[in-house]
């Protein structure tokens, strides 16, 4: 999926699993690193050699999931709710969950997406102590092991707490596979102010590379635009 829907995810999977990524060890943008250039050239090569879906610039992750369910794609990177997606779509396919392939000498890295439950302290509030007590009561209620586990199942999310992870893995082998993968997750550098431009930029790099433009030049230009 190199579409405007999730093209930044494709960039992540290939670069992270080649030892690259969006930023370097100092959290500075490193979009044109050697590892990224190599990874993206490899990905484009897979497309050009006919090893992928035929139109990655227009076929979204949902199209890919349907192709996988129909037996038209042998291997795909998918979300933890893929079992439900396939079942709801009436697909019957024999498959297993595995770690994402990585280049020799590189760790396997998966994509992590984190939703946050946050509250904010108001030091000027005269009743802040009572507010804190109410918030604590709610958090204790929400993160009760049984209740929180049920909520994860209902939403199709993966848990934050180890106790919920243990409960879900015990009851469902599917959950166990996904929980194991959590340990290898990276996250987008979404707190950096340039992230929106980077996200759009790497998608444009992919799509222009699919049209035949030089990957090194495209990433050099993006790095210059973002980091100066």
Q: Where are these predicted regions, by residue range?
A:
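Long, aromatic- and glycine/proline-rich binding clefts that accommodate carbohydrate-like moieties
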Residues: 98, 152-206
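Pocket-flanking alpha-helical
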Residues: 10, 63-67, 82-90
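Extracytoplasmic/periplasmic solute-binding protein
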Residues: 1-30, 44, 73
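Extracytoplasmic/periplasmic substrate-recognition and gating elements
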Residues: 49, 88-156
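Glycine-centered hinge/linker elements that transmit conformational signals in sensory
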Residues: 26-57
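Beta->alpha turn/N-cap motifs
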Residues: 61, 78-83, 113-115
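Paired acidic/hydrophobic, glycine-rich loop segments that form the ligand-binding mouth/hinge
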Residues: 74-79, 96
């Amino acid at each position: 999926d190199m579409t405007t829907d999730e093209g930044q995810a494709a960039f992540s999977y290939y670069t992270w699993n080649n030892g690259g990524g969006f930023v370097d060890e100092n959290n500075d943008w490193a979009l044109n690193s050697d590892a990224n250039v190599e990874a993206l050239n490899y990905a484009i090569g897979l497309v050009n050699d006919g090893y992928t879906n035929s139109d990655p610039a227009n076929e979204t992750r949902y199209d890919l999931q349907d192709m996988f369910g129909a037996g038209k794609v042998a291997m795909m990177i998918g979300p933890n709710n893929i079992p439900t997606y396939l079942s709801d779509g009436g697909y019957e396919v024999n498959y297993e969950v595995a770690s994402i392939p990585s280049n020799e000498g590189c760790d396997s890295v998966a994509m992590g997406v984190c939703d946050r439950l946050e509250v904010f302290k108001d030091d000027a509030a005269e009743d802040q102590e009572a507010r804190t007590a109410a918030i604590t009561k709610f958090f204790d209620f929400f993160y009760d092991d049984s209740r929180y586990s049920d909520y994860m199942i209902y939403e199709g999310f993966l848990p934050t707490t180890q106790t919920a992870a243990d409960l879900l893995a015990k009851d469902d082998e599917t959950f166990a596979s996904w929980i194991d993968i959590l340990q290898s997750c990276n996250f987008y550098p979404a707190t950096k102010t340039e992230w929106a431009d980077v996200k759009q930029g790497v998608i444009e790099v992919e799509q222009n590379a699919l049209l035949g433009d030089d990957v090194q030049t495209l990433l050099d230009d993006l790095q210059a635009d973002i980091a100066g």
